[in-house]
From Swiss-Prot:
Cystine bridges: none
Modified residues (Phosphoserine): 354
Name this protein carries in UniProt: Mannosyl phosphorylinositol ceramide synthase CSH1
UniProt-annotated location(s): Vacuole membrane
Topology in membrane: Multi-pass membrane protein
Species assigned in the record: Saccharomyces cerevisiae (strain ATCC 204508 / S288c) (Baker's yeast)
């Protein structure tokens, strides 16, 4: 095998390992259908209800608190009905609407180590995302987005230590979540926020990856892989049919997203044109392979075979440049601070009004002049 081909193969393997390392959690999301962690129909809709003498109801774990967030107390009209329905269905629950001012004060008092990061988020929705993780970890309860309205009581969801909901096409979402106080998963979530605070230049991707559903999906995969998820550390997943649009669903969705902007609509358009995205991906991959082929032919070409010559040439150039700089510096130092011997060895100017030393440079006439060196 040619040496150039070995170099190309090693470089590709190193690149592939690096890509897999940084995207491993995203790749595993594609093959995780959440079925092992799903809340079952028996848990959510027991036969004859929880009060049946034939069914022993599990104990309540999550406290009866409903959390929601908004900028102020003035809720947009399209979300008022859904919010009020949640309150009316749960008169025995504590309801808290977290405004921006309340959220900032809470972080400042309870989690001052995160305050600078919290205030430095570029988009308000990132702060709205972050605060929900902190309040669930601190107080426990159920968090519900304002565009999610309640369709039935949430009591069955209180029987597990923590839950998220499955989203499409893969992963979990953060619009409906529940937890006991200080659940290990949400402790990991709040500790991971600083690490994932990155600007991806596209607002949709920045929000999704720093605090949104993509962020919590990645942390969830890491938690499942490295943590003890048995018993009280478990995180159960609410399936789409139990979430909305079915007879026994817990929630309904109101019109009007709470944060999506123009680039989000673009991403949604891509989702609806999967085939076009796949074709574009293949075209992009072709150009990458063509670029690698071009690079390989360059490696095998004549100029690169003389690489030792070019490396030596560059090395000599560098050494010469370094020597010139060093010599120039030393000469300047000598002129600036001559030794006594150097000072005395210099000639004197012939003018009486000037005694400044100078370097005497005289031609040896007898050796250099043609008139005196011609012995013929």
């Amino acid at each position: 095998m040619k040496k150039e081909l070995k170099i190309l193969i090693i470089a590709n393997i190193a690149l592939l390992i690096s890509i897999i390392h940084y995207t491993f959690d995203l790749l595993t999301l594609c093959i995780d259908d959440t079925s092992k962690d799903a809340l079952t129909d028996e848990q959510l809709n027991p036969p004859n209800g929880f009060n049946s003498t034939f069914y022993e109801s599990p104990p309540q774990l999550i406290p009866k608190i409903i959390h929601q967030t908004y900028k102020t107390n003035d809720i947009p009209e399209q979300w008022v009905k859904g919010r009020q329905k949640c309150i009316d269905l749960h008169p025995d629950y504590t309801y808290i609407l977290w405004t921006d001012e309340m959220s900032d004060t809470f972080i400042k008092q309870e989690y001052p180590w995160f305050l600078d990061t919290f205030r430095s988020y570029e988009y308000p929705i990132e702060r709205a995302d972050a605060i929900r993780y902190f309040i669930l970890s601190h107080y426990g309860g159920i968090y519900i987005d304002l565009d999610d309205g309640c369709e039935r009581r949430l009591d069955p969801l209180l029987k597990v230590p923590a839950f998220l909901r499955k989203t499409s096409p893969t992963g979990v979402s953060n619009d409906v979540m529940g937890s006991v106080p200080r659940h290990p998963f949400f402790l990991k979530v709040i500790k991971s926020l600083k690490h994932y605070k990155k600007n991806w230049y596209i607002p949709y991707m920045t929000i999704m990856g720093s605090t949104g559903p993509l962020f919590i999906s990645v942390v969830w995969k890491q938690y499942k892989r490295w943590s003890n998820t048995a018993e009280n550390g478990a995180v159960r997943i609410l399936q789409p049919a139990d979430y909305k649009m079915h007879n026994n669903s817990f929630f309904s969705i109101s019109k009007g997203s709470s944060w999506h902007t123009g680039d989000a609509n673009f991403m949604k358009t891509l989702e609806n044109h999967i085939l076009s995205c796949v074709v574009t991906g293949f075209i992009f991959g072709f150009f990458i392979l063509y670029g690698e082929f071009t690079f390989y032919t360059w490696l095998c070409s004549g100029p690169f075979n003389n690489k030792r010559y070019y490396i030596q040439w560059l090395s000599d150039k560098f050494k010469l440049h370094k020597w010139k700089l060093t010599s120039s510096y030393k000469n300047k130092e000598k002129r600036r601070n001559p030794t006594r011997h150097e000072y005395n060895s210099r000639g004197k100017r012939l003018r009486k009004d000037s005694n400044i030393p100078y370097d005497s440079v005289f031609l040896d006439i007898e050796k250099n002049h043609a008139k005196f060196t011609d012995l013929t």
